[in-house]
Amino acid sequence: MYKLGVDLGGTKIEAVLLDENFNVIKRKRILTPQNNYQKILDSISSLVKELSENTFDYSLGICTPGAISKQTGLIKNSNTQCLIGKSLKEDLENKLDKKISMENDANCFALAEATLGIAVDFDLVFGVILGTGVGGGIVINKKLYPGRTNIAGEWGHHTLHRNGNLCYCGKTGCVETYISGPSLENNWTKLTGKSQHLPEILTDIDNKYWVKWKTEFLENFGYGLANVIDILDPDAIVLGGGLSNIDFLYTEGKESIYNQVFSDLVDTPILKNKLGDSAGVFGACML
């Protein structure tokens, strides 16, 4: 059976068709319609129909930003906010007249890296998304572990600082409000009064506030993932998303994590992803 996967991202929608040996047969990317749920449905439907033309025996998986409520089937906790409260899976199944498997982007990322990517040699893998948002997914023996209510791995909404920054989820102090890309940019602006994008910040090392900004980033990163290790003790942690390209996360960042873990022996591998920004779409294929 062929496998068709769709990755619904904040800026792009990617679809890929794989054969039984995971070879890419067809692939296409388009821009994501902004703040328009109906146009998102139409775009995904058109992509699926285009890539599945003349292919009748295929599974369909969708990778989406945000968790899916096990009770209601509605999207929740999504930073693509026009999806929140929507029955995306049901609406697409009705539109395409086909059964769909659907998981959030962090779960798809983790599954792809654990089955096809950098973490194929590990049994218990925690996949981390660090980008516009912060998320995570757990894979055990090449199978996703969703948890009782489909929120396993959602470390981005752990409380890092009580009464801290306000999060779009309605709570305060979430990890995401400290180490996501926009949060890091906001912190830089508070420190310096300058509005800069993250790539510029990372090279502005002569700024007198740069060391303070970096130190706070590393501390929050370390505390956040140390909590994950204390609870889950994974065989490996894989970093994905735009921030995974920051080299010091694998050196000073790893040291910051290890310093906070409750153990006298800490050797958890902190790995850079292998599949890049296509991990989501390959993970969708594997659902």
Q: Where are these predicted regions, by residue range?
A:
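ATP-binding/phosphotransfer module of carbohydrate and carboxylate kinases, centering on a glycine-rich
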Residues: 1-59, 69-72, 90-98, 115-121, ...
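A secondary-structure boundary/capping signal
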Residues: 9, 63-64, 79, 130
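A cytosolic small-molecule/anion-sensing beta-strand core signal
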Residues: 19, 64, 140-141
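Residue-level detector of high-confidence beta-strand sites
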Residues: 27-29, 78, 147
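A short acidic/small-residue loop/turn micro-motif
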Residues: 31-33, 59, 83, 151-154
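A charged helix-plus-loop insertion that forms the helical arch/lid used to bind
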Residues: 73-85
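ATP-dependent carbohydrate kinase catalytic cores
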Residues: 98-114, 120, 126-128
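Glycine-rich phosphate-binding loop of actin/hexokinase-like ATP-binding domains
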Residues: 120-178
